[in-house]
């Protein structure tokens, strides 16, 4: 009897709790609305707000939509970026490869000029970006055979219709003539190494390349870190996204790679200045890559240090970046996101999930 009574009480609580998930619609009393409905909510990526006196902007410098070979609209792509915590998105549709135009229908082909306006995706993205407060970098991707030539993103283009040339290097020159910055994309894709193709040799020799992707989608090229350091280029990590991020990343619990831009302001002038100065970090796979000084500054901006005694101290990680630190040749120590660890000894260590070279890690020296 007691069990039956208890079950009835629990059931009544469950019904009451369930009922609280609904509310009567303000205009239609015959309609109940599910109470847990929410407006779109942005997932904030918790990183240092400033590093070395510069603001940290989370960006994706390589994206695609149905205006080339992506499977979503520009509007969807920009809203998606806002929901996932980004601040800056580059619109980089392929110039040469736009298969989805065939799917736009007979009406479109009959009523629009044959020569497509290759700036349309940028305009649509800028309009959507204004709504969601996402800064849009106009751009395009110069796309040729990945094994024998390579792919390059032109950023801050003025007119994408004037970039194409049959000669891929001349196409890069055309973009540079507009004031664009050129990023070498996924330098090992479809290849057996990251060695230069003949076209890439010419582009690099002429100083046409401003940055290189060290991470693209699920690819990581540690050797590129040395290249950007030696040549004074900016380093990047991007999605090269074609489908939705839910399909490409969230479903598999992959981290969306991003380029962290350290700039004075989120304007064209501010972002360009940062890229030209190489003030970027590549962030993906719980790994950070870039210049050693920038990495050290980023770590120090992420972690609060509390002195306990002459030998003991605590480190509190105030970001969502996990850190793996190593004192000398000892076993690594995990400093998980939003956690504190107690340590003793000399406050000098390597951060193993930070790379300032193919096989090198930054050394952090703390003072307190």
Describe each model-derived feature in a short phrase:
Residues 23, 32-181, 185, 207, ...:
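A metal-dependent hydrolase metal-coordination microenvironment
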Residues 4-13:
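Sec-dependent N-terminal signal peptides
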């Amino acid at each position: 009897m007691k069990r039956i009574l208890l079950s009835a009480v629990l059931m009544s609580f469950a019904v009451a709790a369930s009922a609280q998930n609904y509310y009567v619609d303000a205009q239609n009393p015959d309609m109940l609305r599910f109470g847990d409905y929410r407006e779109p909510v942005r997932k904030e990526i918790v990183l240092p707000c400033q590093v070395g006196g510069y603001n940290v902007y989370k960006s994706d410098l390589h994206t695609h939509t149905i205006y080339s070979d992506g499977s979503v609209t520009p509007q969807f792509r920009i809203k998606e970026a806002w929901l996932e915590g980004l601040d800056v998105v580059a619109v980089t549709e392929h110039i040469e490869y736009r298969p989805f135009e065939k799917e736009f229908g007979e009406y479109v082909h009959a009523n629009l000029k044959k020569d497509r306006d290759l700036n349309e995706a940028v305009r649509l993205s800028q309009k959507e970006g204004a709504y969601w407060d996402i800064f849009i970098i106009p751009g395009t991707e110069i796309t040729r055979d990945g094994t024998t030539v390579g792919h390059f993103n032109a950023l801050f283009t003025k007119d994408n219709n004037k970039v194409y040339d049959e000669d891929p290097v001349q196409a890069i020159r055309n973009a540079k003539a507009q004031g664009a910055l050129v990023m070498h994309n996924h330098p090992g894709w479809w290849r057996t190494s990251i060695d230069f193709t003949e076209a890439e040799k010419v582009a690099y020799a002429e100083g046409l390349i401003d940055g290189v992707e060290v991470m693209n989608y699920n690819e990581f090229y540690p050797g590129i870190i040395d290249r950007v350091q030696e040549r004074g280029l900016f380093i990047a990590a991007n999605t090269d996204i074609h489908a939705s991020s839910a399909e490409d990343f969230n479903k598999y619990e992959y981290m969306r790679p991003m380029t962290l831009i350290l700039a004075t302001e989120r304007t064209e002038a501010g972002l360009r200045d940062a890229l030209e100065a190489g003030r970027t970090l590549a962030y993906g796979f719980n790994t950070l890559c870039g210049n050693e000084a920038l990495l050290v500054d980023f770590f120090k901006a992420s972690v609060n240090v509390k002195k306990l005694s002459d030998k003991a101290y605590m480190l509190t990680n105030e970001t969502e970046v996990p850190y793996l630190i190593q004192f000398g040749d000892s076993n690594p120590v995990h400093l998980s996101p939003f956690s504190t660890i107690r340590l003793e000894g000399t406050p000098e260590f390597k951060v193993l999930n930070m790379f300032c070279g193919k096989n090198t890690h930054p050394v952090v020296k703390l003072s307190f």
